[in-house]
């Protein structure tokens, strides 16, 4: 089994903020598959089981995401872990896959690294960098950013669908990594 985690913050206050990119992408994937999440008090997370994947949205707030991830990882005895998260070091429209590495100051990744190690797969979704990091990651996308954000999130969702079908991280990485922002037509 593979644990596929979308990072974000719970509550309506944070809906569709930059920091909730992981939640939004998993929500879109689950909706397209005509599935739904159920809340698991045991893992303090929303869960969805599809094929041999556990899709997880921790409800602990970002800084404690590792608690939900570790709980589900141990309970389901998953062999692989893929984290979908926002990355302010990448421009909006860039989507990158990688295995392992540092947390780049991302508090959700820090929490997961501390409890689970840092040798997991990552789907990094660019949100660009703002002047005030905290305000920026907790802000919603501007209207003029929406088309590019939507295209990048759609690309990320399609990458996850490919990964679920192929079970091949390297093929997914090679096929779906975008080193430059997507080009969208106006």
UniProtKB/Swiss-Prot annotation:
What Gene Ontology terms describe what this protein does at the molecular function level? Answer: peptidyl-tRNA hydrolase activity; tRNA binding
Keyword match Phosphoprotein: no
Question: Which protein are we looking at?
Answer: Peptidyl-tRNA hydrolase
Task: Give the keywords, sorted.
Answer: Cytoplasm, Hydrolase, RNA-binding, tRNA-binding
GO annotation, cellular component aspect: cytoplasm
Q: Where does the record place it?
A: Cytoplasm
Provide the reaction this enzyme catalyses. an N-acyl-L-alpha-aminoacyl-tRNA + H2O = an N-acyl-L-amino acid + a tRNA + H(+)
Q: Which residues form the active site?
A: 19
Q: Which family is this protein grouped under? A: Belongs to the PTH family.
Please list the residues that bind tRNA. Answer: 14, 61, 63, 107
Q: Which organism is it from?
A: Helicobacter pylori (strain J99 / ATCC 700824)
Question: What role does this protein play?
Answer: Hydrolyzes ribosome-free peptidyl-tRNAs (with 1 or more amino acids incorporated), which drop off the ribosome during protein synthesis, or as a result of ribosome stalling.
Cite the EC number: 3.1.1.29
User: What SUPFAM superfamilies does this protein's entry cite?
Assistant: Peptidyl-tRNA hydrolase-like
Q: Tell me the subunit arrangement.
A: Monomer.
Residue pairs linked by disulfide bridges in the UniProt entry: none
Q: Name one GO biological process term.
A: protein quality control for misfolded or incompletely synthesized proteins
Question: Which PROSITE patterns does the protein's record reference?
Answer: PEPT_TRNA_HYDROL_1, PEPT_TRNA_HYDROL_2
Q: Where is this site: Discriminates between blocked and unblocked aminoacyl-tRNA?
A: 9
Among InterPro entries, the record links this protein to: Pept_tRNA_hydro (IPR001328), Pept_tRNA_hydro_CS (IPR018171), Pept_tRNA_hydro_sf (IPR036416)
Which Pfam families does the record cross-reference, listed alphabetically?
A: Pept_tRNA_hydro
Site location (Stabilizes the basic form of H active site to accept a proton):
86
């Amino acid at each position: 089994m593979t644990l596929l985690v979308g990072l974000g913050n719970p509550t309506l206050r944070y809906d569709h903020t930059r920091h909730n990119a992981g939640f939004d992408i998993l929500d879109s994937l689950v909706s397209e598959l005509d599935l739904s999440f159920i809340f698991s008090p045991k893992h303090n997370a929303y869960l969805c089981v599809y094929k041999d994947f556990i899709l997880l949205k921790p409800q602990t707030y970002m800084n404690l995401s590792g608690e939900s991830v570790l709980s589900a990882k141990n309970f389901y005895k998953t062999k692989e872990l893929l984290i979908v998260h926002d990355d302010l070091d990448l421009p909006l429209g860039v989507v990158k896959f990688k295995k392992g590495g540092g947390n780049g100051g991302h508090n959700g990744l820090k929490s997961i690294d501390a409890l689970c190690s840092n040798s997991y797969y990552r789907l990094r979704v660019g949100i660009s960098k703002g002047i005030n990091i905290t305000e920026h990651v907790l802000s919603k996308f501007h209207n003029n950013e929406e088309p590019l954000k939507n295209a990048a999130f759609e690309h990320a969702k399609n990458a996850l669908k490919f990964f679920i079908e192929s079970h091949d991280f390297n093929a997914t990485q090679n096929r779906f990594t975008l080193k430059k922002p997507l080009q969208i037509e106006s």
